[in-house]
C-alpha cells in the first residue's frame, strides 16, 4: 500500500505505548475512555458531559457511562458547575495525573527506542 511505510513509525509508537500500558497492569481503558481521558488531561477545560459528547460524536448517556468508569478508576470526577447547577464539570484527579505522567514516559520511550517500551514499564514499576 502506498504511503503506509510513512505511517509505520507512528503506528509502532502507538503499538509500543499501548503494549507498555498493558504490561504495567494499569487501568484497562477502552478507546472511548482513553479519548475522554486525553481530552480532559491535555486540553484546557472546563469539560462538560455535553461538550465531550459533542466532541466525540456520541450521546450524553454514552459519556455518562464513560465517566462512571473513569470515576471507578479514580481517573476523573464529576463536580457541580458553580455557574449552572444542572450541569457538571469533569475534574482531574491525582491518580489521573500520575497515569498521564506514565503515558508520557511510555510514549517518549517508544519514540526513542521502538520495540523497547517494556524498558519504560520496568522503570515505571519501580516507582509503584
Model feature map: region roles:
Residues 46-88:
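Canonical helix-turn-helix DNA-binding module
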